[in-house]
Each structure stands twice: as C-alpha cells, then as structure tokens.
Amino acid sequence: MTATAPTRAASPWQLRLFGTTAPRATILIRIVVGGIFLSEGIQKFVYPGELGPGRFAKMTPLPNPAAWANADGIFEIICGVLIIVGLATRLATIPMIVDMLGAQVFTKFPMAVHQGVWAYFHESRPEHGQLFGLVFLLIVGAGGWSLDALLTRRGRSPGQGPT
C-alpha cells in the first residue's frame, strides 16, 4: 500500500493567475496565437538574415541586435509552447504583449510616418490580431482544455509538487 501525499489547495492568487473560467473552445485561440509565436521564434533561427539578427539590425535602433533577436526568438518559442499547452498561460502572455508592442514601435509606427496611416493599418494587421488574442488570454485564462485547468482542478498550482 502506498501513501499519497495530501494536496494543498491553491491559494487565491494562484487561482487568479492559473485558474480559468473560459470555455474549452479557448484552445482554438491558444493554438493560433501560440502557434504563430512558436513558428516565428523558430524562423528567427532558421532564417537569421531575413527574420532574426539581420532584420533586427535593419529595423531597430537597439544595441547588439543579434542578442535582442535571439532573446526574442527564445521567448517566442518558450511562450508559444506554454500558450499552446495552456501552462502558465497568463504569465506567458505578458512578455508576448511586450513583444507585440515592440514590433509596433520599431517596425510599424515608422511606416505610419513615412507611408501614411492606411499603410500602417494594413501592415500591422497580424500584430493587432496577436495582441488582441494575447489580451483575451490574459483576461480569461487558458480555458477548460489546458494544463492550467487540470492543475487547478486538482487543487495545485503549476510548479507545486506533492507535499
């Protein structure tokens, strides 16, 4: 006979952070939003000249564009996977919201200045879609078909092992 460790109930802040009341269909938004970040992160390493350090060197005034591009790619891969599986989803959205705002500032706002507002609106459609998807996930959580939901149903928060 093996003894099982009792489970501790998740604290109120853990439930707010990892809990979700969103419908199961939220998985569709997670797959699209997380999948795009995963794909874009991988492509920064597969095509470094066009999408990674080379692109960052051309489009951003940041020092050491290679380090920024690589960090961005790593964050997109890690957060993309977390969003897809629904683990720490709300936390994973935060750096990606910053990422999308950075994309707006460094790549799209200059377009509005030089080519006009309509060119900006046209070219920034993907960033706006990603940004609104991320804000949605930040507000409602991962949904019923997620690791966040599974862990909070069991009374544990992610990262909390048996006691």
Predicted segments — roles?
Residues 1-47, 66-74, 78, 85-163:
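Extended, low-polarity transmembrane helix blocks
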